[in-house]
């Protein structure tokens, strides 16, 4: 069905880019079916077809470590707790707002204390999402969002001077942590 819709649209094109978001490195991705489909359509139309693997090259890798910098317990017990983190949805992980999507939290239990994680910026929508915690998080607690390697190089911003996270390589066997790149206010200033 997709083929029948696509062919009339691209038959007079030299090339087309079908974009990113193709998780071609996932174990369950039907890569052979995709190759067959793309080759068949390309041969029938003489149109060169491009796809962008995008995040597939780093899928399921990298963590974004942050810290709880403030905490609010609402007076209404039905409302969730709110933890402000040093991770900004708008500056560090904008797909949370744009896609929208909710990144996985390391060691999140199925049930627990419901906590909304928010960012430090002035943006009202700087919200990462609602998560379960075994214990109510405290100021200074660290959290880790999973599958975040694709944000180390693209889509980050210094929105209102929010500092970007450092990029580090961690060796899980030796527990060695090597900082590759750190950012400062000077980096923000130099972009202006």
Please identify what each model-predicted range represents.
Residues 1-73, 160:
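Active-site loop/helix belt of alpha/beta enzymes
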Residues 48-192:
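Charged (often Lys/Glu-rich) extended helix/loop segments that serve as interaction or gating elements
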């Amino acid at each position: 069905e997709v083929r029948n819709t696509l062919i009339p649209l691209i038959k007079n094109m030299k090339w087309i880019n079908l974009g990113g978001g193709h998780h071609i490195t996932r174990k369950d991705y039907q890569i052979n079916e995709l190759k067959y489909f793309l080759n068949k359509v390309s041969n029938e139309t003489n149109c060169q077809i491009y796809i962008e693997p995008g995040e597939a090259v780093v899928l399921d890798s990298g963590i974004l470590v942050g810290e709880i910098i403030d905490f609010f317990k609402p007076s209404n017990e039905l409302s969730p707790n709110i933890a402000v983190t040093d991770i900004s949805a708008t500056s560090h992980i904008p797909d949370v707002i744009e896609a929208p999507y909710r990144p996985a939290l390391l060691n999140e239990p199925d049930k627990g204390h419901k906590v909304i994680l928010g960012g430090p910026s002035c943006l009202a929508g700087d919200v990462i999402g609602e998560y379960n915690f075994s214990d109510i998080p405290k100021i200074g607690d660290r959290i880790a969002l999973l599958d975040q390697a694709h944000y180390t190089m693209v889509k980050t911003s210094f929105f209102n001077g929010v500092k970007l996270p450092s990029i580090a390589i961690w060796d899980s066997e030796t527990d060695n942590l090597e900082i590759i790149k750190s950012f400062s206010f000077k980096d923000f200033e130099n972009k202006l």
